[in-house]
């Protein structure tokens, strides 16, 4: 029950509010300030018909018309608007005026209505001043302003492919507005078009001209022959008159003018002009303005409540917000009306207005040759021109070029081998060689040092190009020595502006007509200059120095790895040890057979086993010290096979390492991992601001590599190439043509990997240059005739040099001392080792000799001691003999002497003379034998003192024999034999 009460109360309140709103929505007064009764009548009829059009008028909504006549006096117009329109609470005003009365009266209506925020829709005012919303705050118009014709100019220039124009305009508001519109719109318009029109010259004049000759003389110096003119009808007559006198309305000149100039009474034949469709159809514009207003009010009613319009001009405090909102709704309208598609821009100016393209024929006849109209399918304006119906100046049917084609051109080039070689002229030189062309450098103040001569691939191309398409030229070098890149520069001290430097900057700023150089075609440059078809196709590649195999002192060890060498060394000694053990423990190796010959081979010792193992490995003859046992000899045969394989493998690999050709490159190309992940020991670079630099900046996948190489980039390619040769730079990334030339010239350089970033070299020209097509056609003919191939062979590939490089690569490397120095050093080490060992042996031997001497001294002392003992024994024996002798004298017969010696006490005597043997001879002989000896120095034989010695005593006796005689000075010895009795 409570819910039902709440629902009914809510429904009653909403219904009451809706009823009040409908009562308020019931009537809307539309004011009209019109020029004549026909317009007023048509205005009333249109509103009457509108009330029955349910598409635009909601139920219970009715429109009423309130009209006044436009007065030429703007003050009266203001009073009429206040007293006859605003007092009637008009929600909007439609205003028109006569073209001859000026725009003061419509401006008065706009000021007055705008003060109270009442929207005003103009149907005839086209002055640029009404676009200023600071003054005309609530003014819209169903006709476009005059300066919107600049949009149609751009479409026409694009259709005719004119790229350079001269703009002629008056210095009033509309004249400057059309220039600003052209310049502003062209910046965005040409983003979608290939051909960009540039303003070569702007000629501004004061209205109400009396003469235009001075301006025409100045215009003749320009290259463009396309004139876009905004002028009043009176000023246009003066301009056309003087242009005819200067022959500037003849063949080759193109005049495109606005509506006012088109109606001059002396408009030359061939002039193209614009005529707004429905420009004088007040009835059509009245209807469209009323329906636009009804459409806006309908949408506003559905969204919000419209407050009552102001009623009193005397109330200055009135602020009608609904009027401001209604003005915003009006600007968003887009309907199809009697005058075409009706829509507005932010300034309230009509867009999508249609124009007829008028061609002036003989006797001032106007002929429509095209239309600029709204395309419903594409929802935008579209230009259609029938070129075949146009009669151009000089009664020509063929479209003029639109520019004066100069036959003497200013050309620029840059030093880049082999395309352009630059040679400074000597002090005594006045002319270049026949194959050279003068190319001065104009950025130096030294007048004696700026004369150069240029030759090369591009110079030969230029000479042939000039002959083919018939032009003369002045050639100069790039002022800053750069191809050019797009950088930010501070021009005025407060603003930064991006502009081109180098050759591109000279061309963009029109300081040169053509660039003849190895200029890479890329999107950044093509946006600002024209390119011919490529005269040489190329790409980007990498230049590096060929990797040379380092010849160290151990180059002969390169065939085997260190591990293999160690294994071979270990194997030699392991095999030697096993051979020794096998031969030692074999029953046929350690012991000799019982019936064997005494000359049988000795068993293998460890030293001989090592000698055998090395001898087999080094293939030296082994004469002795071979294994004796069968098991050891089997191992020896296996070791010999191993040695044969090792030596053969070493020999083959040595030839591969030292004789065969070197590896080509270190890098595999741009995708080499060492480039993508640049290491500290691998440096790569290109030239700053070059096309290659731009390429790397464009490629996202190369961004990491570019950040690394950016700090290493060089100012010139020449400097970078020199650093590659010196080994300071490992990889230089540059145009393939230049790098292939460098590689063909120097056998130590090589290009790595495949080409990437393929493009071409083209001739650079200004945007819209008349020479572009001619140069392109000539280059295509050169390709077909083989002329470009001839230039390639002559300047880039250097066939004979490249052939020498190939011969050098295929020829085996000759081994030199550097390659095999290690072997000689090894021999030297062996010799030094042998000398060292012999020195060690000598030192060791001296040590042994000293030791032996000490042993000999000790042995001599021992022998001397033993000798002393023997002497004592001998003395005792002598005494015993003497006693026996004395006894014998007493017992034996005279004439005999007994010399018997005890065998046990005199073993030496017994060995020589036998036991119990008497000395033969008489007493005289005994006496001779008993003579004293003179003992000389050590090592000398003893001498007999006095008388001739016995034959036996004259000889040097061995030590053993000398000891047979008793010592002379033994105690108890006497030589006196006088007591003997014979």
UniProtKB/Swiss-Prot annotation:
Main location: membrane
GO MF annotation terms: glutamate-gated receptor activity
Signal peptide: 1-16
Keywords: Calcium, Cell membrane, Disulfide bond, Glycoprotein, Ion channel, Ion transport, Ligand-gated ion channel, Magnesium, Membrane, Phosphoprotein, Postsynaptic cell membrane, Receptor, Signal, Synapse, Transmembrane, Transmembrane helix, Transport
Residue intervals on the Extracellular side: 17-561, 661-819
Record note on quaternary structure: Forms a heteromeric NMDA channel with Nmdar2.
The name this protein goes by in its record: Glutamate [NMDA] receptor subunit 1
Species annotation: Drosophila willistoni (Fruit fly)
Designated gene of the protein: Nmdar1
